Amino acid sequence: MSNKTAKNIRPGELNLKEKLVHINRTAKVVKGGKRFGFNAIVVVGDKEGHVGYGLGKANEVQDAIAKGVEDGKKNVVKVPIVKGTIPHQVVAKYGSAKVLMKPATPGTGLIAGGAVRAVLEMAGIHDILTKSLGSSNPHNVVKAAIKGLESMSDAYEVGERRSKNLKEVFES
């Protein structure tokens, strides 16, 4: 994990919104029949550079969503946003799900599908090109998208790592 993890971020101070990505109904076979349960993947974010995801499991849908939101607030990360897009191209992999994200010019819009779109909307990214490759399992796609966003660094962070100012970073 990088230094941008939830340890530095206080979710209580952020105005977090939530977006439901996927609900799954599970069944446990017992002597009297089937007992159904639900799990929900929820993405939370303030649309200003903070995003997180959570998984909630319960016997009722609303309880599963509420647990997912609480779990998501514990996993919030900071995302670098430059002029409504990401600073550079990134490919992230989680399990067999792979997500490719490319920065886009203003006015392009959010070109993403399914689970990746929910993550990027909650992060506050407006212009981006994405492609989801490999597995389409929403659990792994969400985790790959957040892993990619978390791995990005803006010019200030690169300068700090190299002990250079911004001008020197862009010249090298």
From Swiss-Prot:
One Pfam family of this chain? Ribosomal_S5
Q: Which UniProt keywords apply?
A: Ribonucleoprotein, Ribosomal protein, RNA-binding, rRNA-binding
**Xref: Gene3D superfamilies:** 3.30.160.20, 3.30.230.10
Give the signal peptide as a residue range, or say none if absent: none
Q: Name one GO biological process term.
A: translation
Question: What SUPFAM superfamilies does the database record attribute to this sequence?
Answer: dsRNA-binding domain-like, Ribosomal protein S5 domain 2-like
Query: Which stretches make up the S5 DRBM domain?
Result: 16-79
What domain of life is recorded for the organism? Bacteria
GO cellular component, alphabetical, reads: small ribosomal subunit
What one GO molecular function would you report for this record?
structural constituent of ribosome
Q: What is known of its domains?
A: The N-terminal domain interacts with the head of the 30S subunit; the C-terminal domain interacts with the body and contacts protein S4. The interaction surface between S4 and S5 is involved in control of translational fidelity.
Its function, per the record, reads: With S4 and S12 plays an important role in translational accuracy.
Q: How does it assemble?
A: Part of the 30S ribosomal subunit. Contacts proteins S4 and S8.
**So what family is this one in?**
Belongs to the universal ribosomal protein uS5 family.
The protein's name: Small ribosomal subunit protein uS5
